[in-house]
Amino acid sequence: MKHLRLLGMESEREALLKAMQDMECVEISSIDGSEEALKSGFAKPDDKALMSAQEASRAYRTALASLDRFAPEKKGMFRKRQGVSRAAFFSAESEENARTAAETINKDTRRLGEIESERTKNEALRATLAPWLTVDAPLGGADGALAVFFGTAGLNVTDDALKALADSLDGLLTWQQASSDRSLRYLLVMCHGSVKERALSALRDLGFSTVSFRGMTGTAKENDKALAENLAALEKERQEIEQRIAGLGGKREALLEASDRAAIALRREKAKSRLVGTDKVFLLEGWLPADRCAALEKTLEPFTCAIETREPTEDEYPQVPVQLKNNKLTRPLNMVTEMYSLPAYGTLDPNPLMAPFFILFYGIMMADMGYGLLMMIASVIISKKYRPKGTSGELFSLLGLCGISTFIMGALTGGFFGDFLTQLVAIVSPGTVFALPKLFDPLDDLTMILIGSMALGMVQIVTGMAISLIEKCKRKKFLDAFFEEITWWIVFIGIALLALGKGAAVLYVGCALVLLGPIVQGKGWGKLTGVFGSLYNHVTGYFGDILSYTRLMALMLAGSVIAQVFNMLAAMPGNVIAFIIISMLGNAMNFGLNLLGCYVHDLRLQCLEFFNKFYVDGGKPFRPMTLDTEYVDLQ
């Protein structure tokens, strides 16, 4: 990775950034506070363009969400990405059509929100009016000589209590019950204006609470009718708007393209916000792969700019982004590495070393020709038809590679959906014994498979130790390399020779070196405690790591047994059709469980047992300005 610094003309900034984005190899970083003298007079650009790009991207996403709601697209698990030429993708006509459609859809969507708000408000008002529908008095009350109160009182406020109140006011008060429920009486109280205050005070003493109908005139029934008519009009308008939005379903492809264009523009504006400049020039700093420097310089030849590239200093390593360089075989493993953590800059890319182990181990655990065929077919069909990119593309590429390994290991163990063919032949032709040729049987050769699993684990552990040895030697940590790796190799060789009956001399030498290591490397009392700590940690660590690889045998055995059990159950009716249906259902469940289970266990072996020996994590992902798209395949 190279550090890039570029000084260019402000008038060419937009075109230059588009050229960089088209190359997809430059990550623009924020200008730090160093070299203030150089940067004096430079300022950050305003964020108006960034906010506009964010708004445009949000508008297209909102429009697409509305289409998904009112004009849902029939689609399966995966959406096919339509191929679009760059000329058509970036054309002004395409953008204008999509913008007009998005504005129309979003305007209608906002109106739907307003309609929903009005509907909720009107329904709440109708609920408030419901207890008063039998009352003919106007809700606005009365003025002058007559005072009118709408209100509620508890059920404990009886007619006798109200009659007593009316008597105390010389009969200048009367009331009418509009309705009641389980806890309240809804009362209309009328009195002469001269006793209004006395009546209201006495009513409150009884627990009477007034109800206000602000802004309403006429009776409750009249207002309820008006609200019902308004709700009907709103419902009609809502249906018309939804139909209008649904009628724009044909604009979906244009909106998908526009959403991708907006995302590309937004990435460019975010990068632009990290620049500094004046009204004449701008300054850009960032990172690009070393092998793209010449191509970048050639691309920028038409522009008036000065470019400087240099190797990063060791102090800059934590800030240097990491880009994994892989071929077709190792690229799918990016998703595994990124799920764990990218390697720190300046350290080793683990993918080429991990790929053969990951793919082989997955095949060992799955070990079935039928399952392998399904994985390969799914990988090819999805990759060709839907052209997934990014992590999804890596996932299906890895699925295909693991499918090949699964098929090969299945051929070695004679598994095709378990013993599907054996059981099928027995049903079709009773008395006929048929079995696929196999090198070994998971059920009969358990000991051999167990030893083989641990042997493969030992190979991967030693590989990790060898990588660690090389890296330590590069950093001139020769003592660490000798006592951490070479010493234990001597121990491993000694154990192997002892098991073969060749004596224990080499093992004794290895053990002596294990005890000597902490003494040579430790200080003070640490020499003594280090002997026991190192011995315990390494012995238990290596022993536990090697035992972890027995999961290769366990998952191979589990998958094989489950498949055979389902086939056995399916064969019980003795009917070919019933056998095929039951067997396929059982194998489908077994396949689904093993597909995920083998991945998880394989991932654990790589991340905990293998990476633990040499891997230095903490890398910062390389995020250049790109033309990555979500919905279309840019060609």
Regions found by a protein language model. Give the residues of each.
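Conserved, carboxylate-rich catalytic/transport cores that coordinate ions
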Residues: 1-2, 9-17, 21-28, 294-635
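Long, charged N-terminal accessory/stalk domains
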Residues: 1-354, 382, 389-392, 396
